Amino acid sequence: MARVIVAAVTPVVAVCAHNLYQGEALEYCTYNYSEIPAGFGDDRAIAMRCLVQVHYFCPLEHPARAVVRDLRRALEAADFTSPSVEDAGDDTCQHYVLECEGIDGG
């Protein structure tokens, strides 16, 4: 799932790290996800339903809404559900949380 998330995000935002980014970029994404067994057969899960969060961070003066729109479209194109978006920013930076679901079949 991590590779799918990074592949969807990095054409829009070049830096995408799992959980925590400690680099120098002013614009970046982090992501996390939980797995829930799904698609049962022969008494076992044959797929995982993944609850995904992609966090987009950028400076206050950055035109973030267009990037958030492009991230939403990129996640949809990678077969995630259409993400909900929460503005979690504060007075130091813009922070948007995109939440969606995906299926990991392997």
Where are these regions (language model features)?
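Small/polar-rich, solvent-exposed N-terminal microdomains that initiate assembly or binding
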Residues: 1-41, 59, 67
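Short intrinsically disordered coil segments
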Residues: 44-49, 69-73
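Oligomerization/assembly interface segments of phage tail-like spikes and tubes
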Residues: 46-62, 94-103
